[in-house]
């Protein structure tokens, strides 16, 4: 007033309590960013999923928070603590990372189907051998996957799901055999043919024109001596754990 200023008491601002209207995704694994929408996200101090504090969070606006799910999480409520109080909304499902316990065979070539055992395989999005994606894979169950080896490399077997990745060491990639040449190129039953090439390890079959050799001896990874059976004109074939190779021209 013209006579001065009178005051009484103090003014206290009481912030409105936060609310959560939604969060996406509702199911997530460690490292996933969840977008939480709601109101009154001022002075946020805690964000948690299933009682486990988020690894980190960013308040984008008073109506949005982006929070990263922590490892070792749990299913349950999404919780936000702000200046106005705490809000908890149920419905979050934590997806644990998969584990890989074993696989067979442990050595394989291109096209071989490998059976992988473990846990948490539901919803698998990728399988790799030595860092090379599988040519194809099928989730048989939450504990088993069958995967086809692509042209790859030795190393870890890895399974990836929305919950993360699980790996196990010990896979050996077997390159397919190759035939450089064979002599003689024409031979009768009982004759020995010398086949030269590459990757003649673990040979399981040799044939001439589709007829299995009477016998064969792997001299080295680059040479096979094979005895012609009652054969036919056609391809010379060598099969190993890494695959089968055909070379035409035998009569």
Predicted regions and their residues:
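Ser/Thr/Pro-rich low-complexity tracts
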Residues: 1-251
